Amino acid sequence: MALLQISEPGLSAAPHQRRLAAGIDLGTTHSLVAVVRSGQTETLADSENRHLLPSVVQYRKEDIQVGWQARQQAASDPVNTVSSVKRMMGRSLADIQKRYPNLPYQFQASENGLPLINTAAGLVDPIQVSSDILKSLAQRAEKTLDGKLDGVVITVPAYFDDAQRQGTKDAARLAGLHVLRLLNEPTAAAIAYGLDSGQEGVIAVYDLGGGTFDVSILRLSRGVFEVLATGGDTALGGDDFDLLLANWIREQAGISDNDHRLQRQLLDIATQTKIVLSEADSAEICFADWQGRITRNEFNELITSLVKRTLLSCRRALKDAGVTADEVLQVVMVGGSTRVPLVRNMVGEFFDREPLTSIDPDRVVAIGAAIQADILVGNKPDSEMLLLDVIPLSLGLETMGGLVEKVIPRNTTIPVARAQEFTTFKDGQSAMSIHVVQGERELVNDCRSLARFTLRGIPPLAAGGAHIRVTFQVDADGLLSVSALEKSTGIESSIQVKPSYGLSDEEIARMLKDSMTNAQEDIQVRKLAEQKVEAARVLESLTGALEKDADLLSQEEQVAIDAAVQALIESVQGTSPDAIESAIKQLDKQTQEFAARRMDTSIRRALAGHSVDEI
């Protein structure tokens, strides 16, 4: 399926004019930029032939340092040197301080509770820090290509939520970059590996970077690239390996001081030791007045529990995809942390096959992003690649009784648009509150609230008379827009969902587990709630009818209806949906004659004063 060559606003669609595009891997620990030149994809190096750019920014009064220079100052100036900023993207200050209590920065909260870091250069937020990293990479690309970039594809973890993705886009715009698309990191890696070889089948992409872990189960078939399921953890990566090793060194050396500068030095030594242990069976450690040695087996014991956590995510993703480990043809290893021998061994044992590591795991994501950028900017209009990503949790609306009506089920491929029609519950209702939720449970209270907005100006008709069409639209970057349209008047209201802080992979996993654990109970709870809503509707409708036409009933009929009403009210107080349903049917039976008389009376009133010819 070929992509249509439609020029972006401001870009020429002239044939033979090659446009400059780049793929950027905006990583937690390191970032890279890659391009396609003369048909070959390559990552770009700096003047000292270093391809990786540390995702570190130092803010000084006189200037800003990005990358290697900033990293060198991290130990001596930790307060003004921001690293692993990706972990802060889209999160509230309270969430960050709870997750990472030992960060050395001087934080203060913005008006909406987001983090601001007080530096020598003033207050900066995660978007500004990310923007400075992107700016540095863009300058490297433009210098190498000798021209201005027409567009970039930036990669993000598969489990980044709307706020985190929007923050990444905002950082790119702040850096003066035109974002062609945000691309999931595992998806980018699969482009670099799977599509080039043309292999069809199921592939697992295991991406363990510095700060995040993602696993994607993909299917490649006849040029169609589909993500079957995703999983992972936005707060687990090689940085955690370093932290465990740094704590081990601290214990062995008998260090009790919690000085931030000392902690940074310990982390630097731990990182270097981890790298040595990827090649050697043991490593010598020198810190202050202490000297020691750690073996690879000792290091493995420290990190085994973390690696097992990643494999649990793999197991869940396989289950979501409806495939077994035996059906996986290849396992793609992504991220610098996959160089750790224990990681490769445990992943190989889990999938029962040797993982693919032929492309540098640090560069493979940037390479895939560059390939995609080259296509999206219009340099490969004949490309047969079709890319489909998925949403991690179902999206829906709250309906009467606190129930959830799912509009887009989880693991639906994106971009996607789905619509459903709803109606009013009460007579004369002129407004409707739209509550957007995310999750797999049947009740709103058990799901995550995303946004609320109100559609006003609905014609005040009888209950059920107005028809409101609610449309959910998720774009290629995973951002959700919800609109509500009253069909008779054309009145519309909409909202773009941008949560103020992120949803961790652990929370997603918990929500999925809870939905499975409580599935039977949820069905019963939903059935009970639905019957209670129906009972309320019936009672409200009957109350209105009696207020207008009670004179149509005999005393005996009134007593019988009152008894049926009381029985229904009592059943609603209970927990049996069947009892409520039975009481509704009994009330309906008692009021059938009343309804027929009301209909006859309405017809007579309508015909009064009119001749047969007029009718």
UniProtKB/Swiss-Prot annotation:
The gene is hscA. HAMAP family: HscA. Keywords: ATP-binding, Chaperone, Nucleotide-binding. NCBIfam families: HscA, PRK05183.1. It comes from the Bacteria. This is Chaperone protein HscA. PANTHER family: HEAT SHOCK PROTEIN 70KDA. GO terms for biological process: iron-sulfur cluster assembly. The keyword Cell membrane does not apply. InterPro entries: ATPase_NBD, Heat_shock_70_CS, HscA_NBD, HSP70_C_sf, HSP70_peptide-bd_sf, Hsp_70_fam, ISC_FeS_clus_asmbl_HscA. Chaperone involved in the maturation of iron-sulfur cluster-containing proteins. Has a low intrinsic ATPase activity which is markedly stimulated by HscB. Involved in the maturation of IscU. One of its GO terms (molecular function) is ATP-dependent protein folding chaperone. Belongs to the heat shock protein 70 family.
